[in-house]
A protein has these predicted regions:
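Short C-terminal tail/terminal secondary-structure segment
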Residues: 82-85, 136, 226, 237-252
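Active-site helix of classical SDR
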Residues: 111, 147, 155
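Residue(s) in the substrate-gating loop at a strand-loop-helix junction
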Residues: 131
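Conserved glycine-rich Rossmann-like NAD(P)H-binding loop of the short-chain dehydrogenase/reductase
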Residues: 19-35
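Conserved glycine-rich cofactor-binding loop
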Residues: 3-6
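Alpha-helical segment proximal to the catalytic Tyr-Lys
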Residues: 116, 160-164, 234
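Substrate-binding pocket helix/loop in short-chain dehydrogenase/reductase
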Residues: 86-88, 92-100, 206
């Protein structure tokens, strides 16, 4: 499981561990991984700091997983980042390349490494965390939108390739979910009452356009992810699940 230090990834790691899974989690920094290791239920989990935008980082994480567990039952590709805010004219070639490596190639490389181990599992699953930005892109951060669309397409392609192995591959596409990036925006307001008000204002303003009238929280995705990783989802593959409080209103 990647991107576990904050937000959706952290919530997923905690939820999977609560259900008895042994979690191998990766993120770039060590401080938040250390706090997760103290909070998570159960034992035998491993947490590894690596830069998954680099092939060497992906390989190092996978080797650590194999050394600790000797196999993989479910791969959750969650790591992702906007990296650069801006419209098409404000995003450079370097920004596009960085987004490609973080948001798409990290998943490609981990899938490639994990598939041989997944073939040996009795309940093999790949879950890619994309975004509604893949299907409903806005003007801002086109590089991120495009890479998330690529990740969603990778899901469908891989699902067909791996169907004969019984490996189910699905996508979860969240809408606006409170995460570290939103927290950083609040932190920019300083501490104390002003920061709390900034958080409240952001959540209220964002929630206005959502039929359920609130932003999502990371925990809103955990039930679906657990289901997709379970034996109960054995006839579900190549599917994109939108979790956005009804924001995109897509009937198909």
């Amino acid at each position: 499981m990647t991107g576990v230090a904050d937000g959706i990834g952290r919530a997923l790691a905690l939820a999977f561990a609560k259900e008895g899974a042994q979690v191998a989690g990766c993120s770039r920094g060590t401080e938040r991984l250390d706090s997760l290791a103290k909070e998570i239920e159960g034992s035998g989990h491993i947490f590894f700091a690596a830069d998954l935008s680099q092939a060497e980082g992906v390989r190092a994480f996978f080797d650590k997983v194999q050394e600790a567990f000797g196999g993989v039952d479910a791969l959750v590709n969650n790591v992702g980042a906007v990296l650069k805010l801006g419209n098409f004219f404000e995003v450079s070639d370097e920004d596009w390349e960085n987004s490609f490596q973080v948001n798409l190639m990290s998943a490609v490389r981990l899938c490639r490494l994990s598939i041989p181990a997944l073939r040996k599992s009795s309940c093999p699953r790949i879950i890619n965390i994309s975004s509604i930005a893949a299907s409903h892109p806005q003007e801002i951060f086109p590089h991120y939108n495009a890479m998330k669309a690529g990740l969603s397409n990778l899901t469908v392609s891989l699902a067909q390739t791996l169907a004969e192995d019984g490996i189910c591959v699905n996508t979860i596409s969240p809408g606006p979910v409170w995460s570290r990036s939103w927290e950083q925006e609040v932190e920019a307001q300083g501490s104390g009452p002003s920061a709390e008000q900034a958080k409240k204002d952001i959540m209220e303003q964002t929630g206005k356009s959502i039929p359920l009238k609130r932003m999502g929280m990371p925990e809103d995705l955990t039930g679906l992810a657990l289901f997709l990783a379970s034996e109960q989802s054995s006839w579900i593959t190549a599917t994109n699940f939108t979790v956005d409080g009804g924001l995109t209103r897509n009937p198909f």
